[in-house]
Amino acid sequence: MRHGHGLRKLNRTSSHRLAMLKNMMNSLIEHEAIKTTVPKAKELRRVIEPMITLAKVDTVANRRLAFDRLRDRDSVTKLFNELGPRFAKRPGGYTRILKMGFRVGDNAPMAFVELVERAEEGAAEAKAAE
């Protein structure tokens, strides 16, 4: 039986998939909004939401767990100093996935992944990038 095994393989090896998700987590923490395909966005949501929940309680052990998963000191610092306190009263649902049409080259469905309570400077950056 195949119960409870609902992860997407995304046509990648396991090491490539893990590295890609780490990079996407770091980008989302740094920029607070990224553009990607819909399946990647849905997988990213599955891994970033527990990281933000972990950052709500700022302990050395939690920082070490976060660093083990992110491998970037700047991302861990921002996660615990800015994002954890920002989402302290929100019981989950930290990300929003907005569908935004199809990619020109291969017609892949694209999505905009952003943190729900974005900082104002992050919102201004995203509008400038569009």
From Swiss-Prot:
InterPro entries: Ribosomal_bL17, Ribosomal_bL17_CS, Ribosomal_bL17_sf. GO terms for cellular component: cytosolic large ribosomal subunit. Pfam families: Ribosomal_L17 (PF01196). Keywords: Ribonucleoprotein, Ribosomal protein. One of its GO terms (biological process) is translation. Coiled coil: none annotated. Signal peptide: none annotated. It comes from the Bacteria. GO terms for molecular function: structural constituent of ribosome. Belongs to the bacterial ribosomal protein bL17 family. Part of the 50S ribosomal subunit. Contacts protein L32. HAMAP family: Ribosomal_bL17 (MF_01368). This is Large ribosomal subunit protein bL17. It comes from Delftia acidovorans (strain DSM 14801 / SPH-1). The lineage of its organism: Bacteria, Pseudomonadati, Pseudomonadota, Betaproteobacteria, Burkholderiales. The gene is rplQ.
